[in-house]
């Protein structure tokens, strides 16, 4: 009896999985599944991990070029509890056939197993990534912020969405950086003679170098370095806002 029950469950699992191998099965009408992101920087494709991770939307993960987790998610049925019960109750012959092989307790466990397995499919799987205009705009701003913080102050990012057949789409991002800004000179203006003398002792350890490209992170590191150095030298209440 247990073997028969296991075969029934296995058959349901295999049938459901094969039926689910349609990547757009859970994509609503008038929506599109994101199948590819492409980033072009100054006309050249750049899909390095660092740049690609700036995007707010990534396509569904793939294993050997197969969106396996998406297929697993698609195998789940919406409202499975009502579907299972309605399916059995609406077909008296099916209920009698199940009751012939299963006891009342086993039938309840069968229904419980169907619902539990369906929930497992949802949590283990990955919902389809639907192209989202707001997230595309956020990605554009994120790309601009990244390049701005690395010295390209005139950066501009745009995008284009290409819809494909069968409710799929690709998104291309185009980044024009302009020329980078270079630090050509460094000057200091420190009102306190004590602070000025402490700063000059460690000035050679500065993260900011002449003729190097501007980077926001470099200036943040320098502020931290100066603050730590001054506090360690007795200027305990020094603030980075000074």
Model-derived segments and spans:
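C-terminal motif of bacterial Sec signal peptides marking the signal peptidase cleavage site
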Residues: 17-20
């Amino acid at each position: 009896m247990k073997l028969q029950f296991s075969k029934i469950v296995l058959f349901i699992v295999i049938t459901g999985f094969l039926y689910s191998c349609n990547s757009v099965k859970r994509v609503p009408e008038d929506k599109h599944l994101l199948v590819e992101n492409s980033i072009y920087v100054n006309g050249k494709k750049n899909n390095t991990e660092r740049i690609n991770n700036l995007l707010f939307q990534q396509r569904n993960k793939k294993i050997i070029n197969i969106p396996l987790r998406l297929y697993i998610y698609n195998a789940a049925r919406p409202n499975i509890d009502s579907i299972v019960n309605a399916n059995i109750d609406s077909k008296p012959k099916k209920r009698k056939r199940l009751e012939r092989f299963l006891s009342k307790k086993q039938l309840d466990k069968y229904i419980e197993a169907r619902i539990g397995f369906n929930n497992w499919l949802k949590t283990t799987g990955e919902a389809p990534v639907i192209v989202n205009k707001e997230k595309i705009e956020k990605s554009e701003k994120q790309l601009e912020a990244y390049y701005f913080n690395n010295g390209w102050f005139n950066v501009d990012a745009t995008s284009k969405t290409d819809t494909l057949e069968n409710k799929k789409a690709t998104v291309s991002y185009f980044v024009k950086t302009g020329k980078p800004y270079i630090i050509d000179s460094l000057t200091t203006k420190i009102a306190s003679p004590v602070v000025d003398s402490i700063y000059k002792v460690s000035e050679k350890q500065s993260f900011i170098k002449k003729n190097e490209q501007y980077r926001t992170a470099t200036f943040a590191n320098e502020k931290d370095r100066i603050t730590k150095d001054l506090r360690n030298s007795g200027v305990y209440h020094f603030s980075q806002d000074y």
